[in-house]
């Protein structure tokens, strides 16, 4: 057999394997092969700690969070983003010089204890580029050194300022940031602050107690989040407050008065059951709501390099630009 024939055979075999794996991924999980690969990657890279180690790690988290957050250098954002100090909080503003009266306030996730990951920044960079709107990314106060009350105070002030200067404002948040975004909007009802034109929630953490009995059915397929670890971080954020306080668990808050809510949630994450409850609560409250169910998707699938994330990004852009 000639060398070129061997190479051709290897290439064809490789393509056949890829095709078979793609078909299997579609049949078994109803998702792309890349999404299945990402889930495997997450299983091996996302650590689930012993609860004792989580508590011991608080001191390290405080040291990290006390340092000034630095945007990932490989995303080359230095000329595109302005960094400002907003009432003692680090704030990044994308498209600051653009002549637009539309703005996005994005509240990142991280279990209320971690700073934004590379994927967060890459995602908001895409949003800023594709919309051309001003995009605000606050590095809000984190547990265990700070609690939800401090974050609510500074974020409410920031939102009110953004709201007063723009005709259209879109509030977005992922995971813990999604729960915080929803809780903020519920507090706006009480404080008579104008609602965002659209509230966009990506896999929001909306009940920090994680006491929903149905969650246990999703533990085996969840590659990222540990129920026990996440509960500890949530209690640190609560700092002694009742866990059913809507500012911590907006699933229990008043939804009557919210304007328009969009929920993106994967079916292979422990937060899925609570988000289905939230969707039904919003329907019962006569709130305009749309549920984007990511079949076979993992936590905050929107930020990963998979075909489903590209579809979800287009859906987000359609919401914002309609």
Residue ranges and their predicted role:
Residues 2-96:
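A glycine/proline-hinged amphipathic helix-loop "lid/cap" segment
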Residues 16, 24, 28, 82, ...:
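Alpha/beta-hydrolase superfamily serine-hydrolase fold, recognizing
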């Amino acid at each position: 057999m000639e060398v070129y024939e061997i190479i051709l055979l290897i290439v064809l075999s490789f393509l056949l394997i890829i095709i078979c794996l793609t078909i299997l991924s579609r049949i078994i999980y109803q998702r792309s092969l890349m999404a299945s690969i990402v889930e495997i990657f997450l299983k091996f890279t996302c650590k689930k700690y012993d609860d004792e180690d989580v508590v011991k790690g608080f001191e390290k988290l405080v040291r990290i969070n006390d340092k000034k957050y630095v945007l990932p250098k490989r995303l080359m954002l230095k000329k595109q983003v302005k960094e400002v100090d907003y009432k003692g909080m680090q704030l990044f503003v994308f498209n600051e010089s653009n002549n637009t009266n539309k703005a996005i306030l994005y509240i990142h996730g991280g279990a209320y204890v971690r700073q934004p990951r590379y994927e967060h920044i890459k995602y908001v960079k895409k949003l800023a580029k594709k919309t051309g709107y001003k995009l605000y990314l606050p590095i809000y106060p984190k547990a265990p050194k700070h609690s939800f009350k401090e974050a609510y105070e500074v974020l409410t002030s920031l939102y009110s300022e953004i709201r007063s200067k723009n005709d259209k404002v879109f509030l977005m948040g992922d995971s813990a940031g999604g729960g915080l975004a929803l809780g903020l909007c519920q507090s706006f009802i009480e404080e008579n602050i104008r609602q965002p034109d659209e509230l966009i929630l990506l896999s929001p953490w909306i009940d920090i107690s994680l006491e929903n009995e149905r969650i246990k059915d999703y533990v085996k397929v969840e590659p990222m989040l540990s129920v026990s670890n996440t509960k500890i971080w949530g209690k640190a954020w609560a700092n002694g407050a009742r866990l059913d306080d809507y500012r911590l668990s907006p699933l229990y808050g008043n939804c009557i008065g919210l304007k328009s809510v969009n929920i993106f949630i994967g079916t292979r994450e422990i937060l899925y059951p609570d988000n289905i409850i939230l969707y039904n609560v919003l329907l019962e409250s006569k709130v305009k709501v749309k549920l984007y169910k990511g079949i076979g998707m993992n936590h905050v699938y929107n930020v990963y390099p998979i075909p489903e994330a590209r579809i979800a990004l287009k859906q987000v852009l359609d919401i914002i630009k309609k």
